[in-house]
């Protein structure tokens, strides 16, 4: 739990009283490799901190092709935010790429703490600003304005060591390229 608190306080400081109230909402959950935390079409009500393991969020096009939107590793918050906030079904599926240990909480119960714990509300706002606004915008711009090699190098910085933990085709999908293109990029970088 201390590792989680440290990670949270990198975003925003919270009081001991707020921490106690928040941790009372957490319950452990295990998701096996290939298991689903939230499926496209489900109404998301929960969010989860990743204690251990790797998860991806992806969507499918009309033909069924999968596109990776993001990855979640230790310390990250996984949530179908659009579904939780809008009350509409999720467009994303959250799949475990390894066995995953989660600390799960009900989002509405978390919001219920805001009246007495303003620091938790501030934490959520800062998390949303950082992860779901700033980083999302930067990624969208990178997908259009940078070459695949630059996107791959940025992926390595954003997710250190992840490329050794997940299949390469998931990375290629995230970068918006084919697995063959990714192999060529990796080969060129190793040669230089």
State each model region's role:
Residues 1-27, 83:
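Cyclic nucleotide-binding regulatory module and flanking cytosolic helices
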Residues 10, 36-96:
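Cyclic nucleotide-binding regulatory domains
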Residues 76-77, 109, 132, 181:
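Short, well-ordered alpha-helical scaffold segment located
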Residues 79, 138-151:
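Short, Lys/Arg-enriched anionic-surface-contact patches
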Residues 90, 109-144:
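A small-molecule sensor/coupling module
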Residues 146-192:
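Phosphate-/nucleic-acid-contacting segments
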């Amino acid at each position: 739990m201390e590792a989680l608190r440290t990670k949270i306080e990198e975003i925003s400081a919270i009081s001991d009283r707020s921490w106690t109230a928040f941790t009372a909402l957490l319950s452990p959950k295990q998701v096996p490799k290939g298991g689903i935390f939230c499926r496209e079409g489900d109404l998301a009500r929960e969010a989860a901190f990743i204690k251990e393991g790797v998860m991806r969020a992806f969507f499918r096009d009309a033909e069924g092709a999968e596109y990776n939107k993001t990855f979640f590793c230790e310390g990250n918050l996984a949530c179908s935010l659009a579904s939780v906030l809008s009350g509409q079904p999720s467009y994303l599926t959250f799949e475990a790429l390894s066995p995953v240990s989660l600390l799960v909480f009900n989002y509405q119960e978390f919001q219920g703490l805001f009246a007495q714990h303003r620091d938790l509300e501030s934490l959520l706002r800062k998390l949303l600003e950082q992860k779901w606004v700033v980083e999302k915008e930067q990624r969208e711009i990178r997908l259009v304005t940078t070459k695949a090699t630059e996107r791959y190098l940025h992926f390595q910085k954003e997710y250190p060591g992840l490329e050794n933990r997940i299949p390469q085709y998931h990375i290629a999908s995230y970068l918006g390229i084919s697995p063959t293109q990714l192999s060529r990029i990796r080969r060129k970088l190793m040669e230089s």
